[in-house]
């Protein structure tokens, strides 16, 4: 009976992939519809070394931080996804964090590293570069440095910086279905890395025009050229002479001398910045008439993006913390997460 039904329902369907229509065969019955990339079995090319370095800054400074980290690890971190993950745990009062209490890392290329919480994200990333990497084009490494440090920046094609103030990724179920049937190597990060090219060198979820247009730093993606621009010492782009990845004492210092200069430097180098926001596609933010977008408002504040709040399915990651002024997108993300969990709990079948 099952074989008969399979023969009856297995079919060829048209799909639009990479600009062309292809016919694929698939059996449409499944225990429940796909809801996230954790459900997708993706072809892994074991012959390719990891070419993405991801640095995630975790600070348990709000009630959702642990949940954000757990959600990300469970949905995204997979063996063979071409990413080296470094989760930096910011210690409170310099007290070691019990890593057995943290979400389990099942990938052999995912690691926890502990650091005293005396810097914000950019300063902590700078500490990581100074203590664990070689290959910084602006620093001469001694033989001792090369012996003590193990991560060569030059082996990576892309670099992702993010923190525990956000939750995601969120993708519409129909997008997950499309990816699952296309039989291509598409990962959660591909929606960002695919936007990096010869013209675009800094990508994130959102661009804010508060003060000046800039990619918001809760998630930043760049390549080796972009990283070289960001790593360069000096006050270029509005940074302090020490550079962008400096340990600044306050959040305002970080915004003024790290976050804003990151985008400034990319634009001043003749490259573009980009985000997932539909409104800002193919906009050259180096042009003066584009510098006052969205009335210079921060888009992730409730109803601050042309009278609307950010949609998780558009920007993939949203602010998810205790602030009242981010509750709209946080509430929507919470609802999507519940709906996706409900699909599995009720063992709903796909038709």
State the predicted function of each range.
Residues 2-351:
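ER/Golgi luminal nucleotide-sugar-dependent glycosyltransferases, focusing on the catalytic module
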């Amino acid at each position: 009976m099952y074989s008969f039904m399979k023969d009856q329902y297995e079919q060829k369907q048209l799909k639009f992939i990479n600009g062309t229509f292809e016919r694929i065969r698939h059996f449409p019955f499944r225990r429940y519809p796909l809801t996230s990339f954790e459900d997708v079995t993706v072809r892994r090319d074991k012959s390719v070394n990891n070419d993405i370095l991801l640095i995630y800054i975790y600070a348990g400074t709000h009630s959702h931080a642990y949940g954000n980290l757990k959600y990300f690890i469970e949905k995204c971190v997979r063996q063979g996804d071409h990413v080296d993950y470094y989760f930096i745990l910011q210690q409170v009062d310099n007290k070691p964090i019990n890593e057995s209490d943290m979400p389990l890392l099942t990938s052999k290329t995912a690691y926890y590293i502990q650091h005293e919480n005396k810097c914000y994200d950019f300063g902590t990333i700078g500490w990581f570069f100074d203590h664990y990497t070689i290959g910084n084009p602006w620093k001469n490494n001694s033989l001792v440095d090369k012996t003590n440090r193990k991560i060569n920046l030059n082996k990576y094609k892309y670099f992702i910086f993010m923190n525990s103030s956000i939750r995601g990724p969120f993708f519409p179920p129909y997008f997950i279905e499309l990816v699952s049937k296309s039989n291509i190597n598409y990962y959660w990060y591909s929606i960002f890395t695919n936007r990096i090219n010869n013209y675009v060198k800094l990508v994130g979820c959102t661009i804010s025009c508060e003060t000046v247009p800039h990619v918001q730093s809760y998630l930043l993606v760049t390549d080796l050229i972009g990283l070289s621009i960001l790593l360069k010492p000096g006050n270029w782009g509005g940074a302090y002479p020490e550079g962008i990845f400096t340990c600044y004492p306050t959040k305002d210092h970080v915004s003024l001398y790290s976050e804003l200069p990151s985008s400034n430097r990319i634009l001043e180098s003749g490259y573009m910045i980009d985000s997932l926001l539909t409104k800002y596609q193919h906009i050259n933010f180096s042009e003066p008439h584009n510098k006052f977008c969205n009335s210079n408002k921060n888009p992730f504040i409730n109803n601050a993006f042309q009278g609307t709040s950010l949609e998780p399915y558009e920007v993939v990651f949203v602010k998810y913390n205790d602030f009242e002024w981010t509750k709209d997108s946080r509430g929507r993300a919470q609802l999507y997460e519940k709906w996706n969990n409900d699909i599995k709990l009720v063992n709903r079948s796909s038709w």
